[in-house]
């Protein structure tokens, strides 16, 4: 891939890439837009080639759209191994988590990795339990870091010429705060992250509300990394 011309013309994924402004709008951790964008890649069996595509919400959540598309477009034996990586602008809701769990139960040799930019309604217990169920099912769930943002930019975005390297314009602190909340979800702790959006200003405010259970069960270095301790 040439950094002088953007994605090369012969790139077979070019028509499936999204535009830079779409990537910024969907994956900005300070923007709480309702729509969800999914960037995904699939690797079949021991093959080295990776199949990439993108998707967005329609009348249904993008996770449901992916599952139906994946299961209807081709048949593969249950013994076939497949690795799927999702880069989501929002983590799955509780209902989508159930659908994902059912999908994985029917395809035991599928491995799923989820990288999310933000946590969807993270104070809703149904969503929190859904993420825990996915983790228990063996799904790896992480908050996107600079590394994932740069990877998505190079592989899913029709970036401008001479602009192959991407640096998120979002504060690294937001990533750490979402990661801390995901850690709380994994441990079954109550929410510690408060997010408010003031409609009269284009700003999103993050605040920690730590309880004694958080201090008791979360390692100090993880709390210190937020910069709030």
From Swiss-Prot:
Coiled coil: none annotated. The active site is at residue 63. GO terms for biological process: cytidine to uridine editing; mRNA processing; positive regulation of gene expression via chromosomal CpG island demethylation. It comes from the Eukaryota. It is found in: Cytoplasm; Nucleus. Its main location: cytoplasm. GO terms for cellular component: cytoplasm; nucleus. It is an enzyme of class 3 (hydrolase). Transmembrane segments: none annotated. It catalyses: a cytidine in mRNA + H2O + H(+) = a uridine in mRNA + NH4(+); cytidine(6666) in apoB mRNA + H2O + H(+) = uridine(6666) in apoB mRNA + NH4(+). InterPro entries: APOBEC/CMP_deaminase_Zn-bd, APOBEC1, APOBEC_Cyt_Deaminase, CMP_dCMP_dom, Cytidine_deaminase-like. Residues 10-134 form the CMP/dCMP-type deaminase domain. Keywords: Cytoplasm, Hydrolase, Metal-binding, mRNA processing, Nucleus, Zinc. SUPFAM superfamilies: Cytidine deaminase-like. Its cofactor is Zn(2+). Its EC number is 3.5.4.-, 3.5.4.36. Binds 1 Zn(2+) ion per subunit. CDD domains: cytidine_deaminase. Cytidine deaminase catalyzing the cytidine to uridine postranscriptional editing of a variety of mRNAs. Form complexes with cofactors that confer differential editing activity and selectivity. Responsible for the postranscriptional editing of a CAA codon for Gln to a UAA codon for stop in the apolipoprotein B mRNA. Also involved in CGA (Arg) to UGA (Stop) editing in the NF1 mRNA. May also play a role in the epigenetic regulation of gene expression by participating in DNA demethylation. Belongs to the cytidine and deoxycytidylate deaminase family. Homodimer. Interacts with A1CF; form an mRNA editing complex. Interacts with RBM47; form an mRNA editing complex. Found in a complex with CELF2/CUGBP2 and A1CF. Interacts with HNRPAB. Interacts with SYNCRIP. This is C->U-editing enzyme APOBEC-1. It comes from Mesocricetus auratus (Golden hamster). The lineage of its organism: Eukaryota, Metazoa, Chordata, Craniata, Vertebrata.
